[in-house]
């Protein structure tokens, strides 16, 4: 007897619950994932098409501040809007899984195992800091100029060229919540994932896949591999997010993008 085909897993980009989906969101990852899922199902392949909201993003904090509400309230409102928009578009996505204790346990189990295996390294880094507000700036809390393409960019990665900018690399940083606040730099010891340790494996992985990719994505990977690979933050001195479980970074949170892989795992079985 022939076994049933293995289900395909299609995971759309995780939407940030700092507002409803706009046309660019809908026409981009969610419609594309829906079309691909329908195609696979049309060929007889079972499909799990899913995603989940990335509640820990700093964009939630910045937007909530502008609207005069709490981040928790913004997440609740926005998640409901996102679910309605996905349903109104007629996607075959089964729904958004709840970001609850099961989700947090999945994330913590994932990072704890990597930590125990010695994958993370302690680094003392220089971080932008809003002096009057008393907060460290990263991702959606900081804006400035991309050091690679010189376009306007938030922290973490440039949406124009795709290159990362970590720690103190963003030029002319401003606090997005209050651009008049004075930005200084302070050192903090955090955990990072040193991607350079995995260069050989990453190079082999992308060499086998980028020939099928679109030109812009293929070029970006080539540019990234031609440079020293970044050290991805694992923890960060902040308050909004999942508390880091590691004794050497007490009082810090897990960097939101470290949740991405366990979030994808969680979204497939909830």
Locate the predicted segments by residue.
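Short, solvent-exposed loop/turn and secondary-structure capping segments
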Residues: 23, 60-62, 151, 159-160, ...
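Residue-level signal for inorganic ion chemistry
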Residues: 114, 158, 259
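Structured secondary-structure scaffolds
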Residues: 2-32, 37-43, 48-51, 105-106, ...
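Generic secondary-structure signature for well-ordered alpha-helical cores
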Residues: 87, 116-119, 163, 207
